[in-house]
Swiss-Prot record:
It is a multi-pass membrane protein. This is p53 apoptosis effector related to PMP-22. PANTHER family: P53 APOPTOSIS EFFECTOR RELATED TO PMP-22, P53-INDUCED PROTEIN RELATED. Keywords: Apoptosis, Cell adhesion, Cell junction, Cell membrane, Cytoplasm, Membrane, Transmembrane, Transmembrane helix. One of its GO terms (cellular component) is Golgi apparatus. It is found in: Cell junction, Desmosome; Cell membrane; Cytoplasm. Disruption phenotype: Knockout mice exhibit postnatal lethality and defects in stratified epithelia. Decrease in expression of Dmkn, Krt83, Sost, Lama2 and the amelogenesis pathway proteins Ambn, Enam, Mmp20 and Klk4 in first lower molars at birth. Upper and lower first molars show defective enamel formation and architectural abnormalities suggesting impairment of enamel matrix secretion and mineralization at postnatal day 2 (P2). Induction: Up-regulated by UV irradiation, doxorubicin (DOX) and Tp53 in embryonic fibroblasts. The keyword Transmembrane applies. Component of intercellular desmosome junctions. Plays a role in stratified epithelial integrity and cell-cell adhesion by promoting desmosome assembly. Thereby plays a role in barrier function of the skin against infection. Plays a role in mammary epithelial tissue homeostasis and remodeling during and after pregnancy, potentially via its involvement in desmosome cell-cell junctions. Required for tooth enamel development via facilitating desmosome-mediated ameloblast adhesion to the stratum intermedium during the transitional stage of amelogenesis. Disulfide bonds: none annotated. Gene3D superfamilies: 1.20.140.150. The keyword Hydrolase does not apply.
Length: 193
């Protein structure tokens, strides 16, 4: 007898694990130094610093690095990414309470809405940074040097994509309340023999 059922009561903890991975990706994006790198490896930038050292520099004025917090767009990009990160952490904590008991399932749509808000903040940050960085430092003036948005910037986008997906699922989960609580009968994809 082949039985293929939907076991939501066992799988419901996947969403908080996805939120935890988004938190890890955001920490990497916030702390990472690989947001932008020149093709000749002379310039490396993070969310916070612009350095002209071969290895990227340490991110301090002593190494000849320039703070991006001197620019309004730099502060805006950092603030919106950090706001998205804080909302994500709050949603991660709330997800445990919301998935623990039947009386807390009403918070799932609230968590979904907050995750959508966090995703909007992060998208704003991840769009402001490359546009304003390119305009401010005139990256297109020297065609011999290419600039590559690197791994830490990619981790920021990965966290944002996870946030968009999780916000969708958290908004849809209340429709499957019986499945989440284990009260629904198993649904068979094949008729029982």
């Amino acid at each position: 007898m082949l039985r293929c059922g939907l076991a939501c009561e066992r799988c419901r903890w996947i969403l908080p694990l996805l939120l935890l991975s988004a938190i890890a990706f955001d920490i990497i994006a916030l702390a990472g130094r690989g947001w932008l790198q020149s093709s000749n490896h002379i310039q490396t930038s993070s969310l916070w610093w612009r350095c002209f050292d071969e290895g990227g520099g340490s991110g301090s004025y002593d190494d000849g690095c320039q703070s991006l917090m001197e620019y309004a767009w730099g502060r805006a990009a950092a603030a919106t990414l950090f706001c998205g990160f804080i909302i994500l952490c709050i949603c991660f904590i709330l997800s445990f309470f919301a998935l623990c008991g039947p009386q807390m399932l009403v918070f799932l749509r609230v968590i979904g809405g907050l995750l959508a808000l966090a995703a909007i903040f992060q998208i704003i940050s991840l769009v402001i940074y490359p546009v304003k960085y390119t305009q401010t430092f005139r990256l297109h003036d020297n065609p011999a040097v290419n600039y590559i948005y690197n791994w830490a910037y990619g981790f920021g986008w990965a966290a944002t994509i996870i946030l968009i997906g999780c916000s969708f699922f958290f908004c849809c989960l209340p429709n499957y309340e019986d499945d989440l609580l284990g009260a629904a009968k198993p649904r068979y994809f094949y008729p029982p023999a």
